[in-house]
From Swiss-Prot:
All copies of domain Obg, residue ranges: 1-159
Gene for this chain: cgtA
Quaternary structure, from the entry: Monomer.
Keyword Lipid metabolism: no
Protein name: GTPase Obg/CgtA
A Pfam entry, by short name: GTP1_OBG
UniProt effect for mutating residue 173 to N: Unable to support growth. Does not bind GTP, decreased binding of GDP
GO terms (BP aspect): ribosome biogenesis
InterPro entries: G_OBG, GTP-bd, GTP-bd_Obg/CgtA, GTP1-OBG_CS, GTP1_OBG_dom, GTP1_OBG_dom_sf, OBG_GTPase, P-loop_NTPase
UniProt note: phenotype after gene disruption: Essential for growth, it cannot be disrupted. As protein levels decrease translating ribosomes, but not individual subunits, also decrease.
């Protein structure tokens, strides 16, 4: 299934049906009174977050959605039926924004959440409503009210407990494959990952969380370089970030500073989120070179990096357990405390909430 995380759509609620101008006509009743029924109300446009979806791809092929028009009223005081509603099904984590793409209308962050986007027009009154002592045979009725129309943006931010960030070719997809049953595309060239991948990490039967791998960032991504920072929105909701750095590259300190700079440029307090720093691909280095890389990275970050290898699996479980601890803190299952992991985790979340 192709991945699409934002789209612009047009919605319009239904017009109300017009009221009827009608008079009672029966045998032996020469002057029957008015009996025009009311028009039905127009259909509404709703949006609902549902489970089982992780893309907005359906809205690439259809961008216009119109609810049904109310049926006109009829004689014998028969009211028109209401127009059919339109319900837009979207993944959990979808944000609804105004046409300016900045004003947030709603954040559908849990399954079953439902929002009225456009209310249908009321049906018009039939002439039965206008009968009075002065005018006992009104020959007019109300037309139905117009429906509402608007353009809106849908933006998906995946619901993940832990986010993977790093430069292209840092080994994020390999790590995701080693940590979960996900099967992301893996190759030895930059930007192999073009869309976010999700994997469920099962530490035990009762310990599990969702891990998100997003496309790699490069210097200048906040200004549009590479794939930009668009996909960072998918880790905004996460409890912590795992920052993977390729231990085989020459400048590990520069790699760290590049990603930190892009996180700060993105905003939304993403740079203040708890971070676990890890040196990946350690199986490709000898002990002396690895020690130099660790010292270099610790000097610039102030954090003692964890050592992992997505290929051999070394250190992966320990890193995942450290990440799960942050998830439990976020869920309220565990109080934040300083322990032996304090050198590995930068815990400065700054009260961030989604």
């Amino acid at each position: 299934m192709k991945f699409l995380d934002q789209c612009k759509i047009y919605i319009r609620s239904g017009n109300g049906g017009g009221g009827s101008v009608s008079f009672r006509r029966e045998k032996y009743i020469e002057y029957g009174g008015p009996d025009g029924g009311d028009g039905g109300r127009g259909g509404d446009v709703w949006i609902e977050a549902v489970e089982g979806l992780n893309t907005l791809i359906d809205y690439r092929y259809q961008q216009h959605f119109k609810a049904g028009t109310g049926v006109h009223g009829m004689g014998r005081a028969r009211h028109g039926a209401a127009g059919e509603d339109v319900v837009l099904k979207v993944p959990v984590g979808t944000e609804v924004l105004e046409e300016d793409k900045e004003t947030l209308i709603a954040d559908l962050d849990h399954a079953g959440m439902r929002l009225l986007l456009a209310k249908g027009g009321n049906g018009g009154w039939g002439n039965l409503h206008f009968k009075g002592p002065v005018n006992q045979a009104p020959k007019y009725a109300n037309p139905g009210q117009e429906g509402e129309e608007r353009w809106i943006w849908l933006r998906l931010k995946l619901i993940a407990d832990v986010g993977l960030v790093g430069l292209p070719n840092a080994g994020k997809s390999t790590f995701l494959a080693a940590a979960s049953a996900a099967k992301p595309k893996i190759a030895d060239y930059p930007f192999t990952t073009l869309t976010p991948n999700l994997g469920v990490v099962d530490l035990s039967s009762s310990e599990r969380f969702v891990l998100a791998d997003i496309p790699g960032l490069i210097e200048g991504a906040s200004e549009g370089a590479g794939l930009g920072t668009r996909f960072l929105g998918h880790v905004e909701r996460s409890a912590t970030l795992i920052h993977l750095i390729d231990a085989t590259q020459d400048d590990v300190a520069g790699a760290y500073e590049t990603i930190r700079g892009e996180l700060e440029a993105y905003g939304d307090e993403l740079a203040d989120k708890a971070e676990i720093l890890a040196l990946n691909k350690i199986d490709a280095l000898d002990e002396e070179t690895l020690a130099e890389k660790v010292a270099e990275l610790e000097a610039v970050s102030g954090i003692k990096p964890r050592l992992v290898s997505g290929v051999s699996g070394q250190g992966v479980t320990e890193l995942l357990r450290a990440a799960y601890k942050q998830v439990r803190i976020r869920r309220g299952d565990l109080e934040e405390e300083i322990d032996d992991d304090e050198d590995h985790v930068d815990e400065t979340p700054g009260g961030w909430t989604p």
